[in-house]
């Protein structure tokens, strides 16, 4: 099982988001604990030799890295689709 960590940007976004949207996003992110690369995630590139994935959550997107050696999923950024990239 993996541990899900949020970057400061991701935490700040969730703090400003409405409660029902925040709950929906957090529920989807919890699923990454069991399977860090689900079939509905997409590889979008590399940063510092680490793969970056996109996870779709309705109109929102979460960008994240999987750190296999320490079993951590690091959520880099969460935002609406046009702004996340």
PLM regions with names:
Residues 1-8, 12, 20-23, 57-60, ...:
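Enriched for short, Lys/Arg-rich terminal
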Residues 23, 27, 38, 45, ...:
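A generic "cationic amphipathic patch" detector
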Residues 30-54:
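A short, surface-exposed loop/turn module that caps and links secondary-structure elements
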């Amino acid at each position: 099982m993996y541990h899900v960590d949020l970057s400061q940007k991701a935490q700040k976004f969730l703090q400003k988001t409405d409660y029902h949207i925040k709950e929906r996003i957090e529920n989807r992110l919890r699923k990454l604990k069991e399977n860090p690369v689900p079939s509905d995630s997409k590889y979008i590139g590399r940063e510092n030799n680490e793969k970056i994935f996109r996870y779709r959550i309705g109109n929102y997107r979460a960008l994240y890295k999987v750190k296999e050696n320490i079993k951590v999923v690091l959520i880099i950024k969460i935002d609406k689709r046009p702004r996340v990239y």
